[in-house]
């Protein structure tokens, strides 16, 4: 997680892509919309949907989330001993219920920037013996009362899989390997027996691991050069696989498109460790600011297309290195930090001033933020053939869809598009092409990595099909700020039989947000759907995100 808004000068990193052949040319070229199945047309938007027999079911980990020891994410977020809202273990029951009902499939932990100064041993064993330390990433007191084993218990309670991060800042390779042994070996070694002595006889069997966090960033504790990091990752991965050969390991990719070494970092890292890792991470945060969007809501709501481009570019680098090394292995992507984050980025919002559980990064989300989150969901599902894991950063209190106080938990506006995807998007992503009228965007005055001229479709759409359940889900974003948009769904080899649910998220005020006093200002509403048929016409409200859940004819 980047502490400061990106303002570094932008090198000509995309010149590198021009040497990657067809794949690089595709994503670097101006008409990148064509690459993701979007085309220009006039009149009603039209979506042509059909089964994609060559596409496997998407990995539901693409709808994961993130929990960092930062601000109130852990303490007073998921964990608050002594609260009347907590159970005997200190877990907030209201938060656990929300997360379990959401069905979050995987949660990344414990960081984030926090991980680069964290020693996992501080957070295990008898609680009275755990040290209180100063977290230097966020200048906050860390009591270590919630650590690895508590996180594993919490994951079991909410039905989520753990994704653990390793300290590649102050941490050593040996420390990382010991952590895997503590978590995954059953018995008979120093660290597995230590876990058993802590009351956890069965191993946690953590499959997914992040090899550090944003190690290219000057804000990161223990920042490394690309090849230095790549060699460390390779060494750690080799030793970790001796302990557990079934691990899935994620190399630390570039911290973002704003970095001067963006893509070059990824290439150099992978040239050192490609054969020892399974995926590479991507991180990105977005906001409606002068630098990023020109304070234009129209440009802001198109930022999920920047995410599309980001994914294609990093995938192109992975494939380039695969070709260089004559490897048969194809890396997948882990977009394990993404969200809207731009208001709570100042020094006061990112510095805990040596206190415990300070109010940090507590972004208040409005309707336009929720619409963009819906766009991000569409992008991630659209690219789920390459993106295996993605984590909405974060889950509770810190740039999060859920916010707590002493009385309960609040659903922010961004909760709803995320919840729809988790509840309804199942099975395979459908092969589709969308034809939509467009509006222009301009590069003038924008930060280089967001600066592009082009035309953006008013309608962004993704659809999934669950063959076993006989159901389909369609998620539709209308970026038109002023007008209703008609969308005609043309089902080519699928016949909807009934509408199971149809809802929309919109309110008159784009800046409206929820509070504990007014928790339903921005909330989903029933939406009148057309009759189920092979040709369905939806009239989407202005500035809206809409779900259609359909039963299919057997």
Model-derived regions, located:
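Acidic, Ser/Thr/Pro-rich beta/coil linker or hinge segments at domain junctions
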Residues: 494-536, 540
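Catalytic cores of secreted or luminal carbohydrate-active enzymes
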Residues: 377-384, 388-394, 401, 405-451
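N-terminal export signals
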Residues: 15-38
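Carbohydrate-binding surface patches
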Residues: 454-496, 502, 543-547
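Noncatalytic carbohydrate-binding groove/subsite architecture in carbohydrate-active enzymes
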Residues: 226-377, 437-452
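N-terminal secretory signal peptides
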Residues: 1-15, 36
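C-terminal segment of N-terminal export signals and the immediately downstream linker at the start
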Residues: 31-55
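Aromatic- and acidic-residue-enriched carbohydrate-binding clefts of CAZyme catalytic domains
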Residues: 73-80, 115-148, 189-219, 288-294, ...
